[in-house]
């Protein structure tokens, strides 16, 4: 028996597509985007909040892809690990953390070294500098005599030379408590790769695990020398500053709280069956990660995962419906692992497709990235007519925005706009409904107040457009849907469930963005037809 094709709900996440009314240095406003412009003009639209307390982060903290997708998929504001860990340091409860105390108890009698690895940044996206300083204080209280800090500089979620003030702040704290020394220096480009570019990780690993090739200069002198060569924080080559290699019997705390860019270095340091580059396993190591990077890692976890029940993907599966997720490499974990509340395993009926990202050093060299292939995959899935929910992420505005190169970011934005035309054509064939939004801002701000390239995210709101399909009419509105203007990312999942006529579970504390229907039903809106 042949079933009629399903009219899907398609959630399109334009990663890093924020809203800023000023046109100057705004890659989104300056780019040619006829598709988004026409959709914004014709269809119901609003701006939603993606930062700070609206996504479970501290006041003033910019959002990011992990947090954004987690909040979207959960349908509620999820307290973030940044806040959990900061609170534990502030209230002193970190001094009772069992995983950290166990590590200290194992290395203290042997007077072994404690290694602190993480992104030395106040960006708050992968880590926070306050957490490193809190660990130094913990080590002091616990009587650890030798603490080696492996500095990873940012330059992506912060300004490109914010590594220098971060290092100076670390040194001030070291001088204050008389404990700790910075022994290696590496840009996140090497130490925090997440795309299996193992040659980069290998360079960072070798520097951290060997005392050979000590530079001889202070860490600030080394960093300034790289700046003088126009090599900024993200791209600092791994450099040994002082003795203090990771050796058998030592303790290691990896204090990044976001898993995706910490996993590969952790695999190299801990996995017995690691084969991605030649190395001898350093064993035994007492190893703690701040959060759970991967259940397979042979490490202790200081802050266990929060269990989220009745998230969007789970509710769709419970209804016996099929769903499709697609993104290229850079954002694939976000539409799968993070969207599913930190669960690696797909739900029943959830199909995933990973499109490889281009192998380039930085994405200004390929601003189109793999958007065309992502679009082809998603259109094929939509036209199968078997999926009730389709989730797709376009990485371009965010990944190219991170380069700080305006022209490239404009090309990235224009690429995505063209892809939307093809995607909407496929959705129109089945009468589906489309939600177009973003997880956070980025490409709308390419220059900071000092005139320097801005490579980080923003706290700006993002657009949300609802394109109601002929085959997926929202009950009770007669084609005249109105959207709230006070929404946030947590409200997207309840909105999708309302469109699908599925009850919203009590765990979802977000509210549908669709305003209650007015008594008077107005004429249906004439749909935009995209000419290809």
From Swiss-Prot:
Q: Which GO terms describe its biological process?
A: glucose catabolic process; glycolytic process
- One GO cellular component term: cytosol
Protein's UniProt name:
2,3-bisphosphoglycerate-independent phosphoglycerate mutase
Q: Which PANTHER family match?
A: 2,3-BISPHOSPHOGLYCERATE-INDEPENDENT PHOSPHOGLYCERATE MUTASE (PTHR31637:SF0)
InterPro entries for this protein: Alkaline_phosphatase_core_sf (IPR017850), BPG-indep_PGM_N (IPR011258), Metalloenzyme (IPR006124), PGAM_B_sf (IPR036646), Pgm_bpd_ind (IPR005995)
- What family does the database annotate? Belongs to the BPG-independent phosphoglycerate mutase family.
Cofactor(s) for this protein? Mn(2+)
Domain of life according to the entry: Bacteria
């Amino acid at each position: 028996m042949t079933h009629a094709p399903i009219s899907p709900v398609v959630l399109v996440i334009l990663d890093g597509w924020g809203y800023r009314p000023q046109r100057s240095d705004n890659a989104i406003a300056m780019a040619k985007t006829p598709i988004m412009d026409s959709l914004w003009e014709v269809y119901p639209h609003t701006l939603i909040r993606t930062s700070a307390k609206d996504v479970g982060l501290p006041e003033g903290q910019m959002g990011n892809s992990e947090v954004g997708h987690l909040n979207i998929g959960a349908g509620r504001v999820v307290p973030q690990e940044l806040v959990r860990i900061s609170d534990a340091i502030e209230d002193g409860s970190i001094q009772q953390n069992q995983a950290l105390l166990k590590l200290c108890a194992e290395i203290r009698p042997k007077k072994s070294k404690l290694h602190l690895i993480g992104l030395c940044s106040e960006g708050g996206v992968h880590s926070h500098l306050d957490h490193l300083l809190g660990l130094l204080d913990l080590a002091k209280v616990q009587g650890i005599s030798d603490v080696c800090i492996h500095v990873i500089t940012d330059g992506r979620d912060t300004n490109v030379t914010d590594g220098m003030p971060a290092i100076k702040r670390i040194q001030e704290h070291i001088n204050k408590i008389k404990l700790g020394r910075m022994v290696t220096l590496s840009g996140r480009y090497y130490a925090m790769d997440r795309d299996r570019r193992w040659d980069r990780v290998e360079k960072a690993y070798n520097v951290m695990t060997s005392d050979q090739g000590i530079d001889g200069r202070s860490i600030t002198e080394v960093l300034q020398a790289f700046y003088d060569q126009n090599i900024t924080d993200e791209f600092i080559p791994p450099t040994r500053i002082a003795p203090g290699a990771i050796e058998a019997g030592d303790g290691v705390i990896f204090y990044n709280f976001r898993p995706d860019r910490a996993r590969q270095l952790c695999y190299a340091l801990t996995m017995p069956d690691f084969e991605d580059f030649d190395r001898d396993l350093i064993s035994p190591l007492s190893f703690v990660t701040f959060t759970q990077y991967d259940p397979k890692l042979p490490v202790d976890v200081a802050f266990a995962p929060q269990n989220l029940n009745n998230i969007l993907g789970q509710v769709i599966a419970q209804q016996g419906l099929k769903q499709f997720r697609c993104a290229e490499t850079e954002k694939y974990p976000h539409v799968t692992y993070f969207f599913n509340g930190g669960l690696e395993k797909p739900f029943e009926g959830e199909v995933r497709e990973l499109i490889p990202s281009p192998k380039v050093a930085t994405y200004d060299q390929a601003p189109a990235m793999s958007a065309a292939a992502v679009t082809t995959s998603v259109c094929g899935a939509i036209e199968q007519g078997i999926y009730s929910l389709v989730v797709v992420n376009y990485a371009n505005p965010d990944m190219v925005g991170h380069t700080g190169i305006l022209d490239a970011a404009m090309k990235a934005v224009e690429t995505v706009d063209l892809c939307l035309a093809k995607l909407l054509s496929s959705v129109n064939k089945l009468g589906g409904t489309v939600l177009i939004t973003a997880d956070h801002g980025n490409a709308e701000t390419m220059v900071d107040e000092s005139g320097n390239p801005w490579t980080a995210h923003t706290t700006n709101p993002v657009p949300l457009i609802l394109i109601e399909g002929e085959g997926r009419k929202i009950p009770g509105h007669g084609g005249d849907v109105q959207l709230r203007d006070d929404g946030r990312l947590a409200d997207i999942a309840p909105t999708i469930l309302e469109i699908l006529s599925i009850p919203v579970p009590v765990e979802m504390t977000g509210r549908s963005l669709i305003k209650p229907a007015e008594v008077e039903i107005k004429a249906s809106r004439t749909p935009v037809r995209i000419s290809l």
